[in-house]
Amino acid sequence: MKKVLVGIMVFFTFTITQACAYNLKSFSSDSKILSAMQLLEQNGEYEVFANLKKNAVKVKFYHLSMSNVYAANAYDEFGRRVILINSIYKDAPVEQIACLIAHESCHTARKATLDEETRATSKEASCWAKLKRTGVSYPQTKLTKRLDKIANLHIASVEDGNNYIEDKIANSSFYKSQFNL
């Protein structure tokens, strides 16, 4: 009887795992991006994949002429959504690439709003807080500093109930002009 129950449990576990697994290659062909997506999947970031799948999104590295842009959402010639990760971050740690994907996956509107940007940045920050490995020395790049900063804002927001990420975005001159605040 125990063997039958164990067999049934193994069968259901395998079946559920396969049902939840995403075909990551449907999102990208780049090995670094696929590794980042695998890391997101292994850490239970299923919301990221639900957003990507719902919107049939592709993810790729792309030379973004503005070096201060980490990643962006765009549309291809067929109207399909594409997440463009600035190619200057191609050598960034896979955990950081995963955070950029998580952020951009939250954007669904053609024009971002304060609420959407806050959700996206909060998702990016929570992913970094989860994925950043203790004891690993990450390169002190602009991206690392940004991720550390927003992760600290996210943690502080969770601790005291204030939304420091939204405050930071709302007070940013870049976003003030973008959102007409």
Roles of regions detected by a PLM:
Residues 4-13:
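Sec-dependent N-terminal signal peptides
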Residues 5, 156-181:
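Pan-zinc metallopeptidase signature
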Residues 20-81, 90:
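Auxiliary, metal-adjacent structural segments of Zn-dependent hydrolase domains
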Residues 34-37, 102, 117, 121-124:
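Extracytoplasmic/secreted envelope proteins and their assembly/folding machinery
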Residues 99-111:
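Active-site recognition of the HExxH zinc-binding catalytic motif
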Residues 112-150:
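Post-HExxH zinc-binding segment in Zn-dependent metallohydrolases
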